[in-house]
């Protein structure tokens, strides 16, 4: 399994960066997890629209879905140019039916509702879900290709259920919108110590901090998480690659 960070900022993209987007690849299958602002401009450096096999969305905040519309247009233009005719499945929850319905665009993309209490199969990947604590309905994901497992917290304040959900994951991709001396609970986000605690208590192999803030020194997030978790800790950035 190969995971490439496409975008990692919370809220809005920093200059020459993107918000949430993660490319999961196994064999010749490419799965995009979340599709935030400026993600496409980065994604197309790795895989063109016609080679993308599926998209799965954690929730419908702009910084996780802003480039869905442009992706739909990319598929449409590609079909005009004869670059593949397959309909791109976009998986999302249907708790917000208005947003879910926007995932289907003509014959180019089709919104498919995942059932949070059931595993989702997308090519070689099996995805299970955990509801998070966030102002809108949002789901964390545990993604495995049968050999390796990656857990993505999506957006959430801390909850104990992340620990069994993340148990023995090879990589934990945890949101980290706040520093150790800050409390992100009311905003539905976590700080560095909380991310480190989940990684430690779940027995994760590595920790990748993402959904980064637009203030402070990001390496301090890593240092703070390291005071709790003894494993490898990295700060996400566009182009970061993890291979299991």
Curated annotation (Swiss-Prot):
Lineage start: Bacteria, Bacillati, Bacillota, Bacilli, Bacillales
Highest taxon of source: Bacteria
Cited Pfam families: Lactamase_B
Family: Belongs to the metallo-beta-lactamase superfamily.
Organism whose genome encodes this protein: Bacillus subtilis (strain 168)
Record's protein name: Probable metallo-hydrolase YhfI
Keywords tagged on the record: Hydrolase, Metal-binding, Zinc
EC number, as in UniProt: 3.-.-.-
Cofactor, how bound (note): Binds 2 Zn(2+) ions per subunit.
Enzyme class: hydrolase
Annotated residues for binding of Zn(2+) 1: 59, 61, 134, 155
Cofactors required: Zn(2+)
Coiled coil: none
GO molecular function: 3'-tRNA processing endoribonuclease activity; metal ion binding
Alphabetized SMART domains for the sequence: Lactamase_B
PANTHER family per the UniProt record, alphabetical: METALLO-HYDROLASE YHFI-RELATED (PTHR46018:SF4), ZINC PHOSPHODIESTERASE ELAC PROTEIN 1 (PTHR46018)
Positions that bind Zn(2+) 2: 63-64, 155, 211
């Amino acid at each position: 399994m190969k995971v490439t960070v496409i975008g990692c900022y919370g809220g809005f993209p920093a200059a020459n960066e993107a918000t949430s987007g993660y490319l999961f690849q196994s064999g010749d299958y490419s799965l995009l997890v979340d599709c935030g602002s400026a993600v496409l401009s980065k994604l197309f450096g790795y895989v063109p629209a016609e080679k993308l096999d599926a998209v799965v969305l954690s929730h419908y905040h702009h910084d996780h879905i802003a480039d869905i519309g442009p992706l739909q247009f990319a598929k449409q233009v590609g079909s005009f140019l004869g670059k593949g005719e397959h309909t791109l499945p976009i998986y999302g929850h249907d708790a917000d039916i208005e947003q879910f319905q926007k995932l289907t665009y003509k014959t180019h993309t089709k919104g498919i509702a995942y059932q949070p209490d059931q595993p989702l199969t997308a090519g070689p990947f099996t995805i299970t879900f955990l509801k998070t604590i966030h102002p809108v309905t949002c789901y964390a994901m545990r993604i495995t290709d049968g050999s390796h497992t990656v857990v993505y917290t999506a957006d959430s304040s801390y909850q104990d259920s992340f620990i069994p959900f993340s148990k023995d994951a090879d990589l934990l991709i945890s949101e980290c919108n706040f520093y150790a001396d800050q409390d992100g609970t009311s905003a539905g986000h976590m700080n560095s110590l909380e991310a480190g605690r989940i990684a430690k208590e779940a027995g994760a192999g590595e920790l990748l901090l993402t959904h980064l803030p637009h203030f402070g020194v990001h390496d301090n997030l890593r240092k703070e998480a390291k005071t709790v978790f003894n494993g490898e800790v990295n700060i996400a950035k566009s182009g970061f690659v993890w291979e299991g």
